[in-house]
Curated annotation (Swiss-Prot):
This is Ribosomal RNA large subunit methyltransferase F. Keywords: Cytoplasm, Methyltransferase, rRNA processing, S-adenosyl-L-methionine, Transferase. Disulfide bonds: none annotated. It is found in: Cytoplasm. It comes from Vibrio parahaemolyticus serotype O3:K6 (strain RIMD 2210633). Its EC number is 2.1.1.181.
Amino acid sequence: MKNNSHNAKQAPSKAAKPKHDNDVNKAKPKRVKKKAAVKAKLSAEKSDVDFIKIAKSGLHESNAHRGRYDFKKLIASEPALASFVIKNPKGEDSINFSDPNAVKMLNKALLAAYYNIDFWDIPEHYLCPPIPGRADYIHRVAELLDGEVKGKYRHQNVRALDVGVGANCIYPIVGVTQYGWHYTGSDVDPKSIDSAANIVERNVALNGKIELVQQMSESHIYRGVIKPNDRFDVTTCNPPFHRSAEDAAMGSQRKLDNLKANQRKKGVKQQNSPVKQGKPTLNFGGQNAELWCEGGEAAFIRRMANESQAFSSQVLWFTTLISKKDNVRPMRKQLEKLGVKAIRVVEMSQGQKISRFMAWSFMDKQQRKTWIELK
């Protein structure tokens, strides 16, 4: 560069003025380059985190609930479902999805037909989950693990932790029966733990595969559950969404109203099952710990991120569902500040509904490879 500058000074004297102008003009690109260098530096800093966003359309290919429900098969597995079956405007078998009794019976039939679950029940007013969507989360998490190896992950060796297992125990049921995982389920609600334990005890397919732990502190998520010698391949969680009981009640009522409006639009009759009038019983319902916490979903997953750092060497992949899209970016920024090495955001769309989960690991690719080799 010095030689080029020296040669430029040897130009004829009559070009002295233009030379001065050119020198001024040359200064501008230098400032632009400086800005570009700053941007490049920032970009390089961001690239320290291996971030991938993945969009998935439709239910996972391994999900047993692709397409319409096979009511003949379901009724054969759970005959009590027959009394809840109705015809939709197209003349196809269906149920009244605003009737919690019908939804609960459908779940029993689905679990019996596709998951070899002989007994499943939940206490009144506890969350009754839509199984196809819940199952898809587990299938996508299994896909995340498969992405760590050539071929298939050794799923029979997987240890998983479900935060907020609930009375329904749905994620451990899917993980155990579909992949052979060993699951630990935690919950702050003792009644949920008792219900989940009852499900495990009364199903041969789950015996010895699911351990249930009560979280004794409402302010903790992983602390008190993950012991010093524990090593989990993955964690799962469906966090409480609402900020208060009132907010949760309004949200459930809004969902019910939307469902009824949609059914009326399609011409579905609603007087098929004997549901008490007055205060609605919602299949969208649930107990306090299932539906709300102070600060809502954003505050819960923020605590989850902070606490996960203390267990960075004991968990390969942390994951959580995130209902509100606006919570994704702040969560990502927080995880980057905490020093995670890899982040995945997996969007799952089923029709008009879009759900997502975020996964993060404090281990880089080589460390994750070593983890897997040592299993």
